[in-house]
């Protein structure tokens, strides 16, 4: 049986080496996020200040996989 993963939204607060980021979730938790392979393959840039969707395992709630970069409301891209 496949493990159930929780999906949260958060804000990138800090960029770390090797595609890792510090993410502040909407419930104010601070976790470590890494970029999923699909985002890495598509060369999607993630910068501090971006809003993202992050997938967190129920076994380790301190790490998560960034699965989607949300569009900013004020930018035109």
Swiss-Prot record:
Taxonomy, superkingdom: Eukaryota
Any single GO CC term annotated in Swiss-Prot or TrEMBL for this entry: cytosol
One example GO MF annotation: translation initiation factor activity
Record's keyword terms, sorted: Chloroplast, Initiation factor, Plastid, Protein biosynthesis, RNA-binding, rRNA-binding
Xref: SMART domains: S1 (SM00316)
Transmembrane stretches, start-end: none
S1-like domain ranges (all copies): 1-71
Location in the cell: Plastid, Chloroplast
Annotated InterPro entries: NA-bd_OB-fold, RNA-binding_domain_S1_IF1, S1_domain, TIF_IF1
Family: Belongs to the IF-1 family.
Name of protein: Translation initiation factor IF-1, chloroplastic
Annotated source species: Calycanthus floridus var. glaucus
Upper taxonomic lineage: Eukaryota, Viridiplantae, Streptophyta, Embryophyta, Tracheophyta
């Amino acid at each position: 049986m496949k493990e159930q993963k929780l999906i949260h939204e958060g804000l990138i607060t800090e960029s770390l080496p090797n595609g890792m980021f510090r993410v502040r979730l909407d419930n104010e938790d601070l976790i470590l996020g890494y970029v999923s392979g699909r985002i890495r393959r598509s060369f999607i840039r993630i910068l501090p200040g971006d809003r993202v969707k992050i997938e967190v395992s129920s076994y380790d709630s301190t790490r998560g996989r960034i699965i989607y970069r949300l569009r900013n409301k004020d930018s035109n891209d």
